[in-house]
């Protein structure tokens, strides 16, 4: 089966696992998925990320994070730039997700960054997704 948007599939798998209160999620690896998973870990949306190497492309294991009473840390994920409609923003036009409570993940010339990091480095890029 050919997948036209592996990033949207990755975000949907995270959203579905989160809604079902799963602890661990495994997805086929790619460099951009690894980058997105590392940003989610760095920003505190997931507990941990493991990269499992195999003889094929590898697997990313994402450990989802919940609050003490089981409340979800990730309340929303939204794919912004899609294969059919790419969305690019200049540095001065970078969005703030929920007035700074969420993050925007961008693909820039400096690599994958959050909106806050892109503002600090003074770069714009393709808006991959919003996470809040």
UniProtKB/Swiss-Prot annotation:
Record-level Gene Ontology MF annotations: rRNA binding; structural constituent of ribosome
Gene3D superfamilies with a match to the protein in the record: 3.30.1370.30, 3.30.1490.10
InterPro entries named among the record's database cross-references: Ribosomal_uS8, Ribosomal_uS8_CS, Ribosomal_uS8_sf
Keywords recorded for this protein, A-Z: Ribonucleoprotein, Ribosomal protein, RNA-binding, rRNA-binding
Coiled coil spans: none
Superkingdom assignment: Bacteria
Signal peptide positions on this chain: none
Keyword hit for rRNA-binding: yes
GO biological process, one term: translation
GO CC entries: ribonucleoprotein complex; ribosome
Subunit structure: Part of the 30S ribosomal subunit. Contacts proteins S5 and S12.
Function, in words: One of the primary rRNA binding proteins, it binds directly to 16S rRNA central domain where it helps coordinate assembly of the platform of the 30S subunit.
Family, per entry: Belongs to the universal ribosomal protein uS8 family.
HAMAP family: Ribosomal_uS8_B
The name this protein goes by in its record: Small ribosomal subunit protein uS8
Highest classification ranks of the organism: Bacteria, Bacillati, Bacillota, Bacilli, Lactobacillales
């Amino acid at each position: 089966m050919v997948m036209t948007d592996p990033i949207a599939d990755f975000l949907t798998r995270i959203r579905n696992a989160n809604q079902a209160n799963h602890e661990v999620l495994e997805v086929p690896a790619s460099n951009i998925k690894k980058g997105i998973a590392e940003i989610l870990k760095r920003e505190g949306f997931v507990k941990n990320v493991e990269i499992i190497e195999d003889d094929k492309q590898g697997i990313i294991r994402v450990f989802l994070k919940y609050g003490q009473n089981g409340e979800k840390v990730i309340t929303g994920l939204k794919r912004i730039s899609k294969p059919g409609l790419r969305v690019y923003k200049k540095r001065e036009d970078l969005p703030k997700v929920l007035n700074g409570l969420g993050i925007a993940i961008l693909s820039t010339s400096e690599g994958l960054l959050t909106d806050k990091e892109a503002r600090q480095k003074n770069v714009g890029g393709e808006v991959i997704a919003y996470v809040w």
